[in-house]
Structures are given as C-alpha cells and as structure tokens.
C-alpha cells in the first residue's frame, strides 16, 4: 500500500526566509508533496470558533483578514526551484483569479522549473476578501462552479498547444465538493480530488463521486483521493488510518507561519513509514 504525505506551507504571517527553510526541511524529512495556498489576503482564524459543515467541510467561525501574505503562483515557482524531489502545487488556485490560458501557461512553466513535478490544483475559492481586494467579482458558489466547468477544458486544451508542452502528464487536482456541478467536473477531468471535512462527509462524498464517474463513463479508481489531515482545526480523530479505510492515500498537513513548525509532519511521516508494503 502506497501512502503519500503532502504539506501545505501557508504563505502567510511570516518571512520568506523562514518559509524557504520549511520547504527544504520538509523535503529532507521525506514529504512527498509541497503545496502553497492562493490568497490575496492573509487569514487569521479563531480556531476555538471553527465549526464543521456537512456540505463544505470546514466553516471558519471567525475569520479576520490581515497580516503578511505572499502570492501563491510565484511561491510555486520558488518551491520548484528550491527543491528537487517532492511534487509541487497549490491547494488550490481559485479559477476566477487568472485567465485559464494564462494559468495553463504558468503551470507548464513551473512544471519545467520543477523538472516535471508540478500538480495544477484548481478550485472555486471561498474567501470574499480575496476577490474584493483585487477587484474580482465574488459570484455565487454555483456561478463559480460553472466557471470551473467552463475553464477546465480550456486549460487542458491550452496545455496541449503550448511549445514546449509540459514535461509529462501534468496532474490536475480539483478541490470541489458541489454535487451538481463541481464534482461532475472532477469525475470528467480530475487526476486528483481533494475532499475535506469530517469523515462522515468524506465518506458520503466519495459515494457521490463513484456515482458521477459511472454516469460519465469514468473509472473511479483513476482518480487519486486526497484530503487535509488537520485535526487541530477540524476536530478530527487523530488516527490517520480512518482515511485509508475510505481509499484515501494522500494526506495533506498544514504548516503555518511565522515558524512553520514540522512536529506533526515528523509524526505522520513516522506513521507512513511504519505501514506494511
């Protein structure tokens, strides 16, 4: 059984030099993938107020905006140039932030910088302040999902046209849990699906994706399932084995500034290395 561990190094609330140290330290520890986030404003989350919702995984009870923040796509290129082994990506790029043809070109370029390690992570965004701060319309969730459905084929088509093309198959990760539109896009196009929330929600959403894959004629097993392993925020069971039982083989932790502590990363890597082959 192959289980891989990802780490989202949040590009907020700290200095770039410390963030770079986190990337290299995580690579040395054996992390399989490094991710960033794509926000235009830093978030300050009141963890004591965090609540869970069946539809969307986690709803931050009190989220303030403010503090240091770095732009996500530039961070991806920096991670690609700084490291040599882990896969590189973002969880995830809100689809409305960039022209889809440009986003494909950016992804292809970082794929070459990383020597073929890039994952293109897409979603619909959720933080109103991100959109409004930079002058983007904060559309309804349904409209953003329709934008995702429209733009993903454009991105895939542009990747085929670029010269040079990506170095190999460039995996497409989609983080969407809307059953009417977003998850159908996952069934049709995604190589990786990032699902999140309490285990009961994850279990139910996996069954929905199985049904949607049947409807579009896609083999469900072609899609790699990923989730956040973030018990301190989501109030989850600390036991990562509950996700393996649902077929999830890629667990993504989060390290936050200003120090980007890797203590939990060390623990989960020790668990991964103890698993039977």
Regions found by a protein language model. Give the residues of each.
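N-terminal beta1-alpha1-beta2 module of alpha/beta enzyme domains
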Residues: 1-82, 198, 275
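Beta->alpha turn/N-cap motifs
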Residues: 37-39, 126, 196, 254
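Internal, glycine-rich beta/alpha segment that forms the wall or movable "lid"
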Residues: 44-46, 58-60, 90, 96-189, ...
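Alpha-helix-loop-beta-strand connector modules within alpha/beta enzyme cores
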Residues: 49-90, 146-158, 214-222, 227, ...
């Amino acid at each position: 059984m192959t289980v891989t561990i990802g780490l989202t190094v949040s590009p907020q609330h700290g200095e770039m030099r410390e963030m770079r140290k986190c990337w290299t330290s995580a690579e040395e520890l054996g992390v399989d993938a490094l991710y960033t986030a794509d926000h235009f404003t830093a978030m300050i989350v009141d963890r004591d107020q965090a609540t869970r919702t069946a539809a969307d995984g986690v709803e931050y009870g009190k989220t303030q905006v403010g503090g240091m923040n770095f732009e996500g796509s530039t961070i991806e290129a920096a991670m690609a140039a700084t490291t040599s082994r882990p896969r590189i990506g973002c969880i995830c790029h809100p689809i409305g932030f960039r022209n889809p043809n440009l986003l494909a070109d950016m992804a292809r370029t970082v794929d070459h910088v990383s020597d073929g390690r890039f994952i293109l992570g897409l979603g619909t965004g959720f933080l109103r302040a991100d959109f409004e701060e930079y002058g983007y319309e904060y559309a309804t969730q349904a409209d953003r999902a329709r934008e995702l459905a429209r733009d993903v084929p454009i991105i895939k088509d542009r990747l085929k046209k670029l010269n040079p093309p990506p170095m190999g198959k460039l995996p497409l990760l989609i983080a969407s849990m809307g059953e009417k539109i977003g998850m159908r896009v996952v069934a049709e196009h995604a190589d990786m699906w990032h699902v999140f929330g309490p285990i009961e929600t994850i279990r139910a959403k996996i069954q929905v994706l199985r049904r949607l894959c049947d409807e579009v004629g896609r083999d469900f097993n072609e899609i790699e399932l990923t989730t956040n392993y973030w018990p301190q925020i989501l109030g989850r069971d600390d036991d990562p084995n509950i996700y393996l039982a649902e077929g999830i083989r890629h667990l993504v932790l989060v390290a936050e500034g200003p120090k980007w502590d890797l203590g939990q990363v060390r623990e989960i890597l020790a668990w991964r290395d103890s698993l039977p082959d």
